[in-house]
């Protein structure tokens, strides 16, 4: 019964992260933080599911590896944007320019 409440809590937190991701379109840092929060909630759901079904947790290690790669790519884009433009506002420059 406790696992069911944990599933509902993780799903609600994932939905809140999605709402923040959709509503914060001005700053790249807020967007990246909400994406990482959503990935963390997906990891917790995956971990609870694998423990509940008595599966091995090797897939969660692969999932975390890809999540770290996604985070590093997002931070590298953030650093390059701050170096070239001085801020992380999406409205201060055109994304389509090279």
UniProtKB/Swiss-Prot annotation:
Keyword Hydrolase found: no
- Name one cellular component (GO) term: NADH dehydrogenase complex
Keyword set for this entry? Electron transport, Membrane, Mitochondrion, NAD, Respiratory chain, Translocase, Transmembrane, Transmembrane helix, Transport, Ubiquinone
Matching entries from InterPro entries are given as:
NADH_UbQ_OxRdtase_chain4L/K (IPR001133), NUOK/Mnh_C1-like (IPR039428)
Reactions accelerated catalytically: a ubiquinone + NADH + 5 H(+)(in) = a ubiquinol + NAD(+) + 4 H(+)(out)
| Gene Ontology terms describing biological process | ATP synthesis coupled electron transport
**Where found, per UniProt?**
Mitochondrion membrane
Q: How does it sit in the membrane?
A: Multi-pass membrane protein
Supply the Pfam families for this chain: Oxidored_q2
UniProt GO molecular function: NADH dehydrogenase (ubiquinone) activity
Q: What is its EC number?
A: 7.1.1.2
Which residue ranges traverse the bilayer? 2-22, 28-48, 62-82
Q: What does this protein do?
A: Core subunit of the mitochondrial membrane respiratory chain NADH dehydrogenase (Complex I) that is believed to belong to the minimal assembly required for catalysis. Complex I functions in the transfer of electrons from NADH to the respiratory chain. The immediate electron acceptor for the enzyme is believed to be ubiquinone.
Q: Which family does it belong to?
A: Belongs to the complex I subunit 4L family.
- What name does this protein carry? NADH-ubiquinone oxidoreductase chain 4L
Natural source organism: Aedes aegypti
């Amino acid at each position: 019964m406790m696992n069911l409440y944990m599933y509902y809590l993780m799903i609600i937190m994932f939905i809140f992260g999605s709402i923040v991701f959709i509503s914060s379109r001005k700053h790249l840092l807020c967007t990246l933080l909400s994406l990482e929060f959503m990935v963390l909630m997906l990891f917790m759901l995956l971990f609870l599911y694998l423990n509940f079904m008595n599966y091995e947790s090797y897939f969660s290690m692969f999932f975390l590896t890809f999540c770290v790669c996604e985070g590093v790519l997002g931070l590298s884009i953030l650093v390059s944007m701050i170096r070239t433009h001085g801020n992380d506002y999406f409205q201060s420059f055109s994304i389509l320019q090279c």
